[in-house]
Amino acid sequence: SCMKAAPMKEVSLRGQGNLAYPGLRTQANLENLGGPNDATRGLTSLADTFEQVIEELLDEQQAIQPSKENKDADLYSSRVMLSSQVPLEPPLLFLLEEYKNYLDAANMSMRVRRHSDPARRGELSVCESTSEWVTAAEKKTAVDMSGATVTVLEKVPVPKGQLKQYFYETKCSSKGYTKEGCRGIDKRYWNSQCRTTQSYVRALTMDNKKRVGWRFIRIDTSC
């Protein structure tokens, strides 16, 4: 049971925080995990610690991204991966961005946001979407930031061979409310439609003059 698993004196993240997450204070609040009588307080502190780790990871990511003075900086996405095989999970930075977007959309404290998670309240999305990894062989071409159509190269040369380019795309689900309108919108008074929207990611491409280079291209990223 939870009460039996609650004592966490043996669980110590001291000395491990900098190894797993450089610069993060993962040991914060773990001193309060005292024993069975402190089970509720201990688990709450642990949850707060995980939230703190996520927030600090986001801060670290923002620190290494281009300056916000660059108008294209906010168009960059972490949905591209170079790999020898199909990735099994969504990219970590993508998950962090999704979490950050959810936090930004809710103007409330983190603890209130956690307890108001839509998944806990049984809420449904206005538009259904699906996400999956696709290869350059499936994309073939894309539109770059200048509006030109470029060829997306399937493989990227590396010192020990070649790696494939994978793109994590999100689009409206064919089983969703794309044609019938958005969920929750009164059709008697409003017309609505779910549409797939795009963002820019950086990929290795070739233009119509056979010039190969890294360019920002548009891929499906939301519904």
Swiss-Prot record:
Function: Promotes the survival of neuronal populations that are all located either in the central nervous system or directly connected to it.
Protein name, entry field: Neurotrophic factor BDNF precursor form
Glycosylation sites (chain numbering): N107
Propeptide: 6-114
Superkingdom of the source species: Eukaryota
Entry similarity comment: Belongs to the NGF-beta family.
Gene Ontology CC, one term: extracellular space
Keywords assigned: Cleavage on pair of basic residues, Disulfide bond, Glycoprotein, Growth factor, Secreted, Signal
UniProt KW Repressor keyword: no
Pfam families assigned: NGF
Disulfide-bonded cysteines: C127-C194, C172-C223
Tagged with keyword GTP-binding: no
Gene3D superfamilies: Cystine-knot cytokines (2.10.90.10)
Natural source organism: Ramphotyphlops sp. (strain YPM 13663)
A GO MF term: growth factor activity
GO biological process entries: cell surface receptor protein tyrosine kinase signaling pathway; modulation of chemical synaptic transmission; negative regulation of neuron apoptotic process; nerve development; nerve growth factor signaling pathway; neuron projection morphogenesis
InterPro entries xrefs: Brain-der_neurotrophic_factor, Cystine-knot_cytokine, Nerve_growth_factor-like, Nerve_growth_factor-rel, Nerve_growth_factor_CS
Chief site of localization: secreted
Signal peptide from the UniProt entry: 1-5
Compartmental location: Secreted
